[in-house]
Structure formats: structure tokens, C-alpha cells
């Protein structure tokens, strides 16, 4: 029986990515900061991200908060000139989506006016209303949870997120709220592999991993790290391919193959995950139970069978209550 090959695609679109997610196809995403680097990997890349990580790998900043809207527009305009086949997504920089809804929409809309197909926005909680406002203006949004580099000063450094029960449940809740706000994809950075797998399995949108284990729909390759390893980049956020290959393009293609078979950064996740926490996380394709009243909490506690289960229900109720305060 002959096998019909998939027709080549002239331009990657969001509906196409979502269809590939449903088909179980592995996707590949890389960064692009200028017109020279952007087209090099393009024939085999699905998403090209003009990331604020350019502040680290191109401009020498220690973190991403110094990156401005003007800097992002500069890098985006350069990448657009290469006419990439991949879906082009641009990062909303620090303070570009914090001040007001109007300013947030203007900054995100500016990306589309310059040729991007979507904007990426970090955080959950209070940022979800901003996501809804942007999407209501017909601007596609990619979410980002876990280790969010723009909040590095609050986190006290580049630290793994989601090892504690309240952190993991809040991340799972935020992931579903972002999906409900119509994000077309979600980045999970610096989260334990088992938590990443639970989140990915419970969502219908594609998930994109950065140092979060192998179970996302796709993995991110920072293109510049195939040439060098800047000291400011977290070691878990890209595959260990630099020493294995002398040719820069061989490095990139090796990283691409690792992403395609879900081995970035490694099949064995470097990020630990407490077994007790794994037992308390919900599984399956349904969002975690959200308890919104004391009466509902009491009814649910009466049906629970163990002290651990009751403790987990109380934590979820606390997180649900905090979500309404944010």
C-alpha cells in the first residue's frame, strides 16, 4: 500500500499547528533575532520566536527586564525581512503589558503591524485579563508559565517552579485559565517533568517546553546557543549539544532531531519532582476541580476518603479563592 506524503506547507498558521497537535505530531520551535539567523533553520521549523532572550544572547544583559518595546520591535522587523515560513511570534517585553489594557493592546498590535503572527506574554493570574483583552482584538496570544524570566527578581533567580503543592496546583489552574482565555499555545519553562506531563495531557492546545522534560508538544531551541553557551542562560533550558558537534549547523540539526523525538533537554529530566506531590495532582483531560464556596468545600470534604485527599481539597479551595482576589 502506498503512503501518501503530506503536502509541503508554504506558511505555518495557528490552525495548522492546532491540527498537528491533535494528530500527535511533534513540533519544533527556535528563536530568531535578526534577518541573518532567522532563515537558516526555517525549512524545518514550525514556530520562530523573536524572544526577549535576545537581551541575553545578543545584547549581553544578565536578564530580560532591561529589554524594551523598541528593542523588540527592532529585532522583529529584522526577522520579518527574511520572510520566514515558520509562524513568527514576538515576545512582549517587561512593562509592555502591565500598565493598562490600552497600552497592552497597542504594543501587541504593533507586533502584528510589523509582520508577526502572534504575541507571547508571560505569567498567569492578573495577566489573564490582559490576554483576554488582546485576543478580543483579534491578536493571537501564546502564554508562558513556570519560570518566567521577567519575574526573575521576584523569584530570586532562575529557579524551578512547581515543586510545591500550591505552586503546582496554581500553575495547573493558570494553564486552564489561559486556555479558556483563548491562548493558542502555552510555554512551560523550568517546571518538573511530571508536572509538565500532567499539564500537557490536560490541555487541548499545544505546550512548548523549555527545560521542562520531554512530554510537551514541542521544544524550544535557542538558536544562538548552538554556536556558544552564554553564561547567563540557565543550563536546563537547552540541549547539551555544543561539545558533541564541531559544525554549527550540525549542532543545530542535532538539537532539532532531539526536539522532534522529545529528548530536549534530556529524556531523564534534570528537575526533580516529589512523589507525594505527584499523587495530589489531578490527571486526565479535565481541569482541576475548582471549589468556590465554603459550603461546596464542606460537601466535597465529606466525600473524601483520606487525610491527604482532604488536605489537597483545602489547598485547591485556597488557590481558587486567591484567584478571585488577584
From Swiss-Prot:
Binding site for 3-methyl-2-oxobutanoate: 52-53, 91
UniProt-listed Pfam families: Pantoate_transf
GO cellular component term of the entry, any: cytoplasm
Pathway: Cofactor biosynthesis; (R)-pantothenate biosynthesis; (R)-pantoate from 3-methyl-2-oxobutanoate: step 1/2
InterPro entries (UniProt xref): Pantoate_hydroxy_MeTrfase, Pyrv/PenolPyrv_kinase-like_dom, Pyrv_kinase-like_dom_sf
UniProt keyword Phosphoprotein present: no
Residue runs in coiled coils: none
Binding site for Mg(2+): 52, 91, 122
Gene3D superfamilies xref list: Phosphoenolpyruvate-binding domains
Residues the record marks as active site: 189 (proton acceptor)
Keyword Protein biosynthesis: no
Broad class of where this protein is predominantly found: cytoplasm
Subcellular location(s) of the protein: Cytoplasm
UniProt remark on cofactor binding: Binds 1 Mg(2+) ion per subunit.
Catalytic activity: 3-methyl-2-oxobutanoate + (6R)-5,10-methylene-5,6,7,8-tetrahydrofolate + H2O = 2-dehydropantoate + (6S)-5,6,7,8-tetrahydrofolate
GO molecular function: 3-methyl-2-oxobutanoate hydroxymethyltransferase activity; magnesium ion binding
Cited HAMAP family: PanB (MF_00156)
Function: Catalyzes the reversible reaction in which hydroxymethyl group from 5,10-methylenetetrahydrofolate is transferred onto alpha-ketoisovalerate to form ketopantoate.
Listed NCBIfam families: panB (TIGR00222)
Family that this chain belongs to: Belongs to the PanB family.
Name recorded for this polypeptide: 3-methyl-2-oxobutanoate hydroxymethyltransferase 1
Organism per entry: Bradyrhizobium diazoefficiens (strain JCM 10833 / BCRC 13528 / IAM 13628 / NBRC 14792 / USDA 110)
Phylogenetic classification of the source organism: Bacteria, Pseudomonadati, Pseudomonadota, Alphaproteobacteria, Hyphomicrobiales
Gene name per UniProt: panB1
Amino acid at each position: 500500500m502506498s503512503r501518501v506524503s503530506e503536502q509541503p506547507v508554504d506558511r505555518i498558521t495557528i490552525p495548522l499547528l492546532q491540527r498537528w497537535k491533535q494528530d500527535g505530531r511533534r513540533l519544533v520551535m527556535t528563536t530568531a533575532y535578526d534577518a541573518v539567523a532567522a532563515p537558516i533553520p526555517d525549512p524545518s521549523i514550525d514556530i520562530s520566536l523573536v524572544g526577549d532572550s535576545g537581551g541575553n544572547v545578543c545584547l549581553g544583559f544578565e536578564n530580560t527586564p532591561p529589554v524594551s518595546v523598541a528593542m523588540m520591535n527592532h529585532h522583529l522587523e529584522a526577522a520579518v525581512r527574511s520572510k520566514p515560513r515558520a509562524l513568527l511570534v514576538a515576545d512582549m517585553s517587561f512593562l509592555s503589558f502591565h500598565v493598562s489594557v490600552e497600552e497592552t493592546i497597542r504594543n501587541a498590535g504593533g507586533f502584528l503591524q510589523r509582520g508577526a503572527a502572534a504575541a507571547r506574554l508571560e505569567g498567569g493570574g492578573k495577566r489573564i485579563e490582559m490576554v483576554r483583552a488582546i485576543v478580543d482584538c483579534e491578536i493571537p496570544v501564546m502564554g508562558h508559565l513556570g519560570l518566567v524570566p521577567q519575574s526573575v527578581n521576584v523569584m530570586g533567580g532562575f529557579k524551578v517552579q512547581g515543586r510545591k503543592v500550591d505552586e503546582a496546583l496554581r500553575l495547573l489552574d493558570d494553564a486552564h485559565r489561559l486556555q479558556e482565555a483563548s491562548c493558542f499555545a502555552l510555554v512551560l519553562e523550568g517546571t518538573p517533568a511530571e508536572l509538565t506531563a500532567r499539564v500537557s495531557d490536560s490541555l487541548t492546545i499545544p505546550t512548548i517546553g523549555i527545560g521542562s522534560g520531554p512530554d510537551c508538544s514541542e521544544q524550544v531551541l535557542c538558536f544562538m546557543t548552538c554556536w556558544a553557551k552564554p553564561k547567563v542562560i540557565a543550563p536546563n533550558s537547552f540541549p547539551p549539544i555544543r561539545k558533541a558537534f564541531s559544525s554549527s549547523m550540525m549542532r543545530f540539526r542535532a538539537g532539532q532531531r532531539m526536539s522532534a523525538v522529545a529528548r530536549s533537554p534530556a529524556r531523564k529530566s534534570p528537575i526533580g519532582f516529589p512523589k507525594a506531590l505527584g499523587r495530589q495532582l489531578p490527571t486526565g483531560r479535565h481541569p482541576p476541580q475548582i471549589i468556590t464556596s465554603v459550603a461546596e468545600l464542606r460537601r466535597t470534604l465529606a466525600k473524601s476518603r483520606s487525610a491527604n485527599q482532604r488536605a489537597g481539597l483545602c489547598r485547591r479551595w485556597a488557590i481558587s479563592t486567591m484567584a478571585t482576589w488577584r
